Amino acid sequence: MSASLPLVFDAPRRGMPPRHLADLSADERRAAVTELGEKPFRARQLAHHYFGRLNADVESMTDIPAGSRAKLGADLLPTLLTPVRNLDTDEGTTRKTLWRAHDGTLLESVLMRYPDRATVCISSQAGCGMACPFCATGQGGLQRNLSTAEIVDQVRSAAAMMRDGEVPGGPGRLSNVVFMGMGEPLANYKRVINAVHRICDPAPEGLGLSQRSVTVSTVGLVPAIRRMTAEDLHVTLAVSLHTPDDELRDTLVPVNNRWKVEEVLQAARGYADHTGRRVSIEYALIRDINDQPWRADLLGKLLHKHLGQFVHVNLIPLNPTPGSKWDASPKPVEREFVRRVREAGVPCTVRDTRGQEIAAACGQLAAEE
């Protein structure tokens, strides 16, 4: 059970897309529009269409003169992501979209509609450099970081799908965004933080979602967690822990060789103290690997010690990936694990796994044509 891939923190610089409206702050948009010889208010018009109306087609923006549309479109609304295909499951309420970026890079996002909410799971990198052996994305390696606008455009597209009733249940609203698709969000720190602002700033400066409805996941990049604490955001922090002991985590989550479990939990506590937000602990339960009763007891003890009331455990039955020798724990083992964690005073629930049939569930995104 050795980690064969190296950890990669710095993505290759190749292939980044042209600049886009969603890469820029409101002031930067005005400056960009002025550089093109247009009046500054055109920036707000473009933002109103893109963020407010979820419209990326500049030719349909008839309140902008035809002569300006081509110029503004080419420079500030280039097509970043083209859908290659949609795969649906759960009677159409789970949709995985494979996207092709301008340089041919492939990435995936997943829209999940529930009775009371709609969540999009988005990618922050094409591939991932964290090399976790039970995750298809990690085993594929890292191609490159996504730009702020490539991240935001996944959310805009999902919001438009919901508004237009493309998912069964009629027209609706996108309510939640989780950075749990391809990539380690905090390894693409600046662009992810900028994307959070675009997602949460009120329209027309952004998409207008509440910060409390956004979750940013990490395998435990301690300096980046501390840096995010200082940003004064109120998004939910999710830590992919997967085991409470350093010996096994060094293999399951290779970044643990750099920052140990206790350091990660201390950084998470700092975030919880600063924001008043509960930290979500993600734990993929793997048969005979990390599902032992003593690990449940240790997990509960450590989380109670470091995070107290500011924690919730999401237990994820392992989703199968091609070529993997591991599978999910049996249900009785899972139930006993939950019972033991709760006995330590730590809330623990089993995640409703969506999209397994179309390789859209946690750890399955491989962006293959």
From Swiss-Prot:
Protein name according to UniProt: Probable dual-specificity RNA methyltransferase RlmN
GO molecular function (one): metal ion binding
Cofactor note: Binds 1 [4Fe-4S] cluster. The cluster is coordinated with 3 cysteines and an exchangeable S-adenosyl-L-methionine.
Positions with a binding annotation for S-adenosyl-L-methionine: G183, E184, S217, S240, L241, H242, N319
Chemical reaction(s) catalysed: adenosine(2503) in 23S rRNA + 2 reduced [2Fe-2S]-[ferredoxin] + 2 S-adenosyl-L-methionine = 2-methyladenosine(2503) in 23S rRNA + 5'-deoxyadenosine + L-methionine + 2 oxidized [2Fe-2S]-[ferredoxin] + S-adenosyl-L-homocysteine; adenosine(37) in tRNA + 2 reduced [2Fe-2S]-[ferredoxin] + 2 S-adenosyl-L-methionine = 2-methyladenosine(37) in tRNA + 5'-deoxyadenosine + L-methionine + 2 oxidized [2Fe-2S]-[ferredoxin] + S-adenosyl-L-homocysteine
Gene Ontology biological-process annotations: rRNA base methylation; tRNA methylation
Top EC category: transferase
Disulfide bonds: C121-C362
Cofactor: [4Fe-4S] cluster
CC annotations in GO: cytoplasm
Enzyme Commission (EC) number: 2.1.1.192
Top-level taxon of origin: Bacteria
Active site: E108 (proton acceptor), C362 (s-methylcysteine intermediate)
Leftover remarks: Reaction proceeds by a ping-pong mechanism involving intermediate methylation of a conserved cysteine residue.
Keywords carried by this UniProt record: 4Fe-4S, Cytoplasm, Disulfide bond, Iron, Iron-sulfur, Metal-binding, Methyltransferase, rRNA processing, S-adenosyl-L-methionine, Transferase, tRNA processing
Native source organism of the sequence: Saccharopolyspora erythraea (strain ATCC 11635 / DSM 40517 / JCM 4748 / NBRC 13426 / NCIMB 8594 / NRRL 2338)
Biological function: Specifically methylates position 2 of adenine 2503 in 23S rRNA and position 2 of adenine 37 in tRNAs.
Residue ranges constituting the Radical SAM core domain according to the UniProt record: 114-357
Positions with a binding annotation for [4Fe-4S] cluster: C128, C132, C135
Protein location: Cytoplasm
